[in-house]
Amino acid sequence: MDIAHDLQSIGAQEQALVFPHFDPARAWALGNRMHALATSRGHAIAIDIVTFGQPLFYAALAGATPDNADWVRRKRNVVAHFRRSSYAIGLRMQQAGATLADKHGLPIAEYSPHGGSFPLTVAGAGVIGSITASGLPQRADHEFVVEALCAELGHDYAVLALARS
């Protein structure tokens, strides 16, 4: 895995995966798309879609645990704080040889810079929330969310996917 290349690719994902508008009905449709995709693959994950301050969709699939819900919360907090994907922030910390606690004073009990939470961005408004998955390895959590967003927004996932490691 090439961290610099992944960070560049994640930046392209974040720029491309922007909704023209977003409302609770769109959150429900996206959440159900993610649920169906995860179910078809046998993923034991938790899925969470929020605008900052308001939950819009949550599902814990068979095999997901309360620990997944806590990972969702902590990853979501990273997106809320930095307005970037949790995986990008984690890779930046890895690149710098630092932690969120060291560099930003953010406690590990509340913030997790692991892959799986992606900014929910609306054209003309910016980042308004997050879409999060937890239960797979962090890179797979991140890519699961990106794949679902590509399908929802009509983008070719093969073009935006991270390079295979």
Swiss-Prot record:
It comes from the Bacteria. Pfam families: HbpS-like. InterPro entries: PduO/GlcC-like, PduO/GlcC-like_sf, YBR137W-like. Disulfide bonds: none annotated. NCBIfam families: PRK02487.1-4 (NF002695), PRK02487.1-5 (NF002696). Belongs to the UPF0303 family. This is UPF0303 protein Bcep18194_A4700. It comes from Burkholderia lata (strain ATCC 17760 / DSM 23089 / LMG 22485 / NCIMB 9086 / R18194 / 383).
